[in-house]
């Protein structure tokens, strides 16, 4: 197995990712009718060649002190997006990356 920190690069923090975490924690933030999830979900940026079993093992190894158990891993590749730099004269691209949404067993969380 690779080093867990080579597989999982960092925690992915966006408004959507925070809303997904908030739905499972049961607080009032981001709660709509019928939008409550039972199991906590967290989003991470992972290595491009990482598989779902590798991601699950790495998350459990990194958060072993908290005793988390991974229930399910969903992955997706985010494509590079075109950007414009300096008043639209020079064009570039953002970097693409692989994102993993990790579902923990009910009652486990990293927060």
From Swiss-Prot:
Summarize the subunit comment: Part of the 50S ribosomal subunit. Contacts protein L29, and trigger factor when it is bound to the ribosome.
One Pfam annotation, family name?
A: Ribosomal_L23
The uppermost taxa in this organism's lineage are: Bacteria, Pseudomonadati, Chlamydiota, Chlamydiia, Chlamydiales
A GO term from the CC aspect: ribosome
SUPFAM superfamilies given for it?
A: Ribosomal proteins S24e, L23 and L15e
UniProt-recorded Gene Ontology molecular function terms? rRNA binding; structural constituent of ribosome
Q: Which family does it belong to?
A: Belongs to the universal ribosomal protein uL23 family.
What is this protein's record name? Large ribosomal subunit protein uL23
Query: What's this chain's function?
Result: One of the early assembly proteins it binds 23S rRNA. One of the proteins that surrounds the polypeptide exit tunnel on the outside of the ribosome. Forms the main docking site for trigger factor binding to the ribosome.
Record keywords: Ribonucleoprotein, Ribosomal protein, RNA-binding, rRNA-binding
